Amino acid sequence: MDADELELKGHLKKLKKEELLRRKQLKESNLQKRELEYNNASKNTSIYISGLPTDKTTKEGLTEQFCKYGMIRTNRDGEPLCKLYVNDKGAFKGDALITYSKEESVTLAIEMMNESIFLGKQIRVERAQFQNKEGDNMHGKENDLKEFNGPEPPIKRLKKAKSEGEGEVIDYNDDESLAKADRTVIFANVFNIYKSYTNDDINDIQEDLLEGCEEIGQVDSISVSPNKGEATVVFKNNKVALQCCKIMTGRYFDGQKLLAFISGDENTSSTSDKNEDSEVEDDLI
């Protein structure tokens, strides 16, 4: 292993220890407060849209537009959670409610669509307040609801790197017989351990992470552990794994700042380091 690789491994190990210490201190200081704040925020993943054209708006058209800003939740029948509201006379009043899978999609949708023009009218998009209004009912007549063929693919959480040396597929002819741990990358902070994920959410995150890693080099396998907030990726060789750590560490993935390190590096740590790391790795979010 050359000097640059040794320096990179040392730097990544230092970053990992600093991050683990920071997170341990954060947990001790305000874990309960953060969990409460997150639970309050995560309850509201809906937007309320008003000012929609009463003669042109359809559920299908609305979901096709707003799925661009995040994955829309679906009901048991697989239909997107989009409600069109009517007044006391049964006429569409120009208001709608859309529920996303993730809270950050609400912020993006508001930023992109509030006071924008939709079907020739300026609309207002805001975070839903869930206040019951007299006379409001879901616009649920069968002949008013059109079949929705599914949202567009969600926005990719990992984009191809543009900086020098990133985003290129690395094909090393490595004939060394490397231990699996030395070519295994552990991604911490992939999942928020205080958040509930559906199976579809987990599959989407795994697919996006795999896509990002395959842009760097050949991947043998990938697995995720939402309860620990981690993902494990096994590469073809150690050089690709090191390059992955260099590229991915510090990158934001689904709103989470990634920490990537070689699994085999932990075997070189002292016993005290292992004990300290094991206390807090399960607390990474």
Swiss-Prot record:
Family matches, as SMART domains: RRM
GO cellular component terms, A-Z: nucleus; spliceosomal complex; U2 snRNP; U2-type spliceosomal complex
Feature: compositional bias, Acidic residues: 276-285
GO terms classed as biological process: mRNA splicing, via spliceosome; RNA folding; U2-type prespliceosome assembly
Gene3D superfamilies assigned: 3.30.70.330
Pfam families cross-referenced by the UniProt entry: RRM_1
Single GO MF descriptor: U2 snRNA binding
Function, in words: U2 snRNP protein which helps to refold U2 into a structure favorable for its binding to SF3b and SF3a prior to spliceosome assembly. Mediates functional interactions between U2 RNA and PRP5. Enforces ATP dependence during formation of the prespliceosome by brokering an interaction between PRP5 and the U2 snRNP that depends on correct U2 RNA structure.
Something else known: Present with 1360 molecules/cell in log phase SD medium.
Entry-linked PANTHER family: HIV TAT-SPECIFIC FACTOR 1, SPLICING FACTOR U2AF-ASSOCIATED PROTEIN 2
Protein name as catalogued: Cold sensitive U2 snRNA suppressor 2
The gene coding this protein: CUS2
